Regions:
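N-terminal, polar/Ser/Thr-rich
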Residues: 15-47, 71-73, 78, 130-134, ...
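Surface-exposed beta-strand/loop patches in extracellular or lumenal glycoproteins
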Residues: 49-69, 150-167, 413, 460-477, ...
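Hydrophobic alpha-helical and helix-loop surface patches within well-folded domains
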Residues: 50, 192, 222-462
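A surface-exposed beta-strand-loop module
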Residues: 67-128, 186, 493-505
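Beta-strand-rich binding/interaction modules
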Residues: 71-76, 427-428, 441-444, 448-512
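Extended, low-hydrophobicity, Ser/Thr/Pro/Gly-biased non-transmembrane segments
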Residues: 109-208
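Short acidic/polar inter-strand loop motif in beta-rich domains
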Residues: 112-119, 513-524
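Solvent-exposed alpha-helical segments and adjacent loops
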Residues: 527-693
Length: 693
């Protein structure tokens, strides 16, 4: 997850105050911050002295950004006081004639308070920022880039030297290389330096225990709270494996150190050369196997090679493909296929026409639909590129971009140029339809037929796609008892016919058997899931009348956790027959009158004080069931049921359901997931079976 967007938002208000020529990365401006901070956790504040060296540029005024809640005490230029105006987070400094020469050395002494409220748990992962830009407290400190905790020159990419003084035992950690921690006279100082320019600096502090391990020239460190220190060994070794993997695939690690830092509230952030994980997050079993590697991959893509946001954020999709998807691929081909299938299901269920946009307009995720586009669809674009141009051209092209654009902005166009050079083909139409056009194709198999012709079997049919058509090379697979044959069908326009000759009689024909092509699925291909509800445009949350007041709070919390766009909570007796046709439904508790409006899947039994899933009975008060079903009233609607057998763990479970987006049903006991699964898919317009002779 990138932290650059806040800086962009802050920047917008200052454009009018910039001198002609501007202070920007494009102008070649060189900026260095020598920043000294003193943290006062019990007062939620800091005191700062920032000495900024500007190597180039001629201007009569300077405008810098600082927290609106800050107080600027004095400003000097080359050791001499200068007049300034500080208002609404903008610091305007008036320069004199003899100041207008390089280097310009500017010192700003200031103080600021940061006390954003922090959550105890993840309410939702779709916008993981929680609104916490900055907090200084006795529990810990988190100050993110763009929060205004140091004076920022908009558009610059500075380097930093940071010295932080805090109460004894409180260590500060940020991007770059640690120059040491020292405790003296009841105070602990932490010193850091960045070697390469960055778009902003984030910083954390807390009572950390530090563990380090060297992997060739890279130091990996964990900054964990004492109660979590036992986890360091596994995290250090896993980080070493990921560093070795990406150095082999892409190129040298761009930084000198990588730090894994524990946060006192739930986060999952990746910054240049360090990741910040909440205390609850680092204990999750899948973090080391997936999320940690994802954040380390961002050191190459997003924090190493920077993103040109004006032309779309490519780095989330590329990182997803080179981390989450690659790890599945290394387990097995089937695991990777299932991962791609889930991308297609997520896109189809979460992205409504009104929410869709092209990848060239993706900046960062803010809801389930934007994640399905910017992470999922984007990952599929890189997958299709890899298949289309071949392994060598794909990996060498990535290495070329990394070498050419390290610590510079890159756009989709840069990837296109690199891949074209390696593959020796034009990719103009590919990028045009997949990056600059919203949506995805939807295609089906039409009139499949088979006939015997002398010693061969002739298979014919058509591929039909909806308007507007895509240029596709669709894989098809014909299977027989003795083996299978794969072919590719070029599709140009809304319909393409094909004919394939086989020496054996096939029993099955499948289009895109490995889910290698980005597409919109048909309803029959998508089992109802948590994501089906998250992608709904309108949900009625229905509670039994007798427990309405008791369960209304948990119902609202569940709706918020799922990031439902539009929902209404009503008692059961207000539900009308037409409502189920016009809305998706979330039942919090079984209906008091009649049966729920969905078909009960095989292996599932639901009662008010017990339920049975796959032959296992659940009847403890701490047991909870959540399931999503196809509506029995309207086949395009879904009905979900949340059935906690008591109120004890209902809130805790409601917070966790959103994390299981791909699943149809979930079982929890004492707040822990006990079982999960997906209803089977038995039909698809992309396969055809012939009966045996």
């Amino acid at each position: 997850m990138s932290r650059r967007m806040l800086s962009t938002l802050f920047l917008c208000g200052a454009i009018g105050l910039w001198p002609a020529g501007g202070l920007s990365a494009e102008s070649g401006l060189s900026v260095h911050h020598d920043l000294m901070l003193v943290l006062h956790p019990s007062e939620n504040k800091l005191s700062g002295l920032d000495t900024i060296t500007i190597e180039q540029g001629k201007f009569s005024t300077l405008t810098l950004l600082l927290s609106k809640g800050a107080t600027v005490h004095d400003v000097t230029v080359s050791g001499k006081s200068r007049a300034f105006v500080f208002k609404d987070g903008q610091l305007l400094i008036l320069l004199q004639n003899n100041d207008r020469k390089a280097p310009l050395i500017l010192s700003i002494r200031y103080s600021a308070s940061f006390h954003d409220p922090v959550p105890d748990t993840f309410a939702s992962t779709d916008n993981p920022g929680h609104g916490v830009a900055g907090i200084i407290s006795t529990q810990g400190t988190f100050l993110q880039a763009g929060a205004g905790w140091y004076p920022e020159i908009p558009g610059s990419r500075p380097t930093f030297h940071l010295l932080v003084e805090a109460p004894a035992g409180t260590l500060a950690v940020t991007s770059g290389r640690c120059l040491g921690h020292q405790t003296k006279n009841g105070r602990t100082s932490s010193e850091w330096a960045t070697q390469f320019p960055s778009e902003g600096l984030s910083m954390s502090a807390g009572p950390y225990t530090v563990r380090e391990k060297n992997f060739e020239s890279v130091t990996v460190a964990t900054y964990f709270f004492p109660e979590s220190a036992s986890l360091s060994h596994d995290y250090l070794n896993a980080a070493g494996r990921y560093l070795a993997l990406y150095q082999e695939l892409i190129g040298p690690y761009p930084f000198q150190q990588f730090s894994i830092v524990e946060n006192f509230f739930p986060t999952g952030y990746g910054f240049p050369s360090y990741t910040l994980l909440g205390s609850t997050v680092i204990r999750l079993p899948f973090i080391i196997e997936t999320s940690l590697g994802h954040e380390i991959a961002h050191c190459w893509w997003g924090n190493g090679v920077l993103v040109d946001y004006s032309h779309g954020n490519w780095c989330e999709g590329l990182t997803t493909y080179l981390a989450d998807h690659l790890y599945k691929e290394r387990i097995s081909d089937e695991e990777a296929r299932q991962y791609r299938l889930q991308i297609l299901r997520n896109f189809t269920t979460l992205v409504n026409p009104g929410d869709d946009f092209p990848l060239s307009q993706f900046r960062g995720r803010y809801d389930p639909a934007s994640q399905a586009i910017g992470y999922g669809k984007s990952a599929m674009v890189f997958h299709m590129l890899r298949i289309g141009i071949g392994e060598q051209a794909f990996w060498e092209g990535l290495k070329d971009v990394f070498r050419a654009k390290l610590f510079k902005e890159a756009s989709w166009k840069d990837f296109q140029i690199a891949f074209e050079a390696r593959a020796g083909v034009s990719l103009e139409s590919f990028f045009e339809q997949w990056v600059f056009r919203k949506g995805a194709p939807q295609f089906s198999l039409k009139n499949p037929a088979m006939k015997k012709q002398q010693a061969s079997w002739i298979i014919t049919g058509s591929i039909v796609q909806k308007e507007p058509p895509y240029d596709l090379d669709l894989p098809i697979r014909m299977s027989a008892a003795s083996g299978r044959r794969d072919s590719k069908i070029p599709v140009r326009g809304t319909e393409a016919t094909f004919q394939v000759s086989l020496q054996v009689r096939p029993s099955r024909l499948v289009v895109d058997p490995e889910c290698d092509v980005m597409r919109i699925l048909y309803p029959s291909e998508i089992p109802p899931s948590v994501n089906s509800l998250k992608g709904s445009s309108s949900v009625l949350v229905v509670l039994p009348k007798a427990s309405f007041s008791k369960r209304k709070q948990v119902a609202g919390f569940l709706a918020g956790s799922l990031s439902l766009k539009k929902f209404r909570i009503i008692p059961e007796d207000e539900l009308k027959a037409g409502d189920v046709k016009e809305n998706d439904v979330l039942l919090v508790g079984l209906p008091e009158n009649g049966s729920p409006p969905f078909k009960m899947p095989e292996g599932l039994t639901l009662q008010r004080h017990r339920f049975k899933v796959n032959e296992r009975d659940y009847d403890r008060p701490s047991d909870s069931f959540f399931g999503v079903f196809r509506s029995s009233v309207h086949e395009e609607r879904v009905v979900a049921l949340f059935q906690p057998l008591s109120e004890k763990h209902a809130d805790e479970v409601a917070r966790k359901i959103t994390h299981y987006g791909s699943y149809s049903y979930l079982v929890f006991r004492e707040g822990r997931n006990e079982a999960k699964g997906t209803w089977p898919v038995t039909e698809s317009p992309l396969f055809h079976e012939w009966e045996e002779e």
